[in-house]
A protein has these predicted regions:
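A local structural motif
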Residues: 1, 24-35, 49-51, 127-142, ...
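Short, glycine-/small- and polar/acidic-enriched structural segments
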Residues: 1-128, 156, 186
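Extracytoplasmic/secreted envelope proteins and their assembly/folding machinery
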Residues: 11, 15, 42, 57-60, ...
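Short, solvent-exposed loop/beta-turn-alpha elements that line the ligand-binding surface or hinge
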Residues: 25, 79-84, 181-184, 250-258, ...
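Pocket-lining segment of extracytoplasmic ligand-binding domains
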Residues: 58, 138-139, 144-230
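Ligand-binding "clamshell"
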Residues: 63-76, 126, 133-134, 167-180
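Secondary-structure end/capping motifs
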Residues: 200-271
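Conserved C-terminal helix/tail region of periplasmic/extracytoplasmic solute-binding proteins
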Residues: 267-291
Length: 291
């Protein structure tokens, strides 16, 4: 069974689960294939090359809007519950005139992909602060390039995630706000998904994957030191940063309020053309019982 993933720290529960045999215990022989990004994973899942993939919620809504029948099968990475555990941020230079969300009006913000999760969460957070988002310019840029671009004055704000938040703060950059938390506590940032064809044809494997992932996430949350250590085996994050960065929040099931809000915002912001059928987007077992 092949899973398409990205080389990011949030893969820690998956790697820990494989290392400790949680997937093998469910009868699953897992092969991980690292892709350049979520955009490359979706077509491989649809074609059947990957049984499962890892990607952000907005991208999956956009895929369904293009009649690609992806389905969320499990949760994964969620935003912080409160200010004490933020792992994302809007970073500015140490000497920036921007000191709060209101100051971002009339400035530029770097996001990894236009019309996607970065822009959606930043817009929602700024609007909640009363900012006229039409005055904000969004620029597309990779996470590794953002901090230096801000420090060099090429862009005013970086929509960042760990470990780049910790790396930026070590250079004196200031985190104005966590746009995920500003949109909604426990916002589902990334999930595991499959194709409807695979979900319908092999529900036993889907259920086994959900159980193994749930066990893996529980283990990761209970063993922070192991989570930090295993990140060093599949990323190029320096050990000093891995030891300091804020670890993501994880959940094997999605937060329904989060999925519904992102669907509404994606439609409002023109990121999709049609309303999302949330029930069709979510496979059995991907949400908490009763939701």
């Amino acid at each position: 069974m092949t899973i398409g993933i990205m080389s990011v720290a949030n893969m820690a529960p998956l790697y820990l689960g494989i290392e400790h045999g949680f997937f093998e215990d469910e009868g699953l022989d897992v092969e991980l294939v690292v892709a350049q990004g979520g955009a490359a994973i979706v077509p491989s899942v649809i074609s059947g090359d990957f049984a499962f993939g890892y990607g952000n919620v907005v991208s999956l809504m956009q895929a369904r809007d293009r009649d690609l029948d992806v389905q969320i099968v499990a949760g994964s990475t969620q935003s912080a519950q409160d200010e004490a555990s933020i792992a994302n941020g809007l970073l500015v230079a140490p000497d920036s005139e921007i000191t709060d969300l209101e100051d971002i009006a009339g400035h530029s913000v770097a996001v990894t992909t236009l019309n996607n999760a970065g822009e959606l969460t930043t817009r929602a957070t700024l609007e909640a602060a009363g900012v006229d988002v039409s005055t904000v310019e969004f620029l597309e840029m990779g996470f590794p390039e953002m901090n230096e671009a801000v420090l060099a004055g090429h862009v005013d704000v970086a929509w960042q995630a760990e470990p780049f938040v910790t790396m930026g703060e070590s250079e004196g950059m200031v985190n104005i706000a966590d746009p995920y938390l500003g949109t909604l506590p426990r916002l589902d940032a990334a999930v595991y998904f499959s194709s409807e064809a695979f979900v319908d044809s092999d529900p036993d494997t889907v259920a086994a994957f959900q159980r193994a992932l749930g066990t893996s996430i529980d283990y990761a949350l209970e063993h922070e030191d192991e989570s930090r250590a295993i990140v060093l085996t599949f990323t190029e994050i320096p050990e000093s940063v891995a030891n300091e960065m804020v670890l993501a929040q994880y959940s094997p099931v999605v937060n329904m309020a989060s999925i519904e809000l992102q669907a509404d915002l994606a439609l409002e912001y023109g990121m999709i053309e049609n309303p999302v059928d949330v029930d069709a987007l979510l496979a059995d077992g991907s949400r908490a019982e009763g939701e």
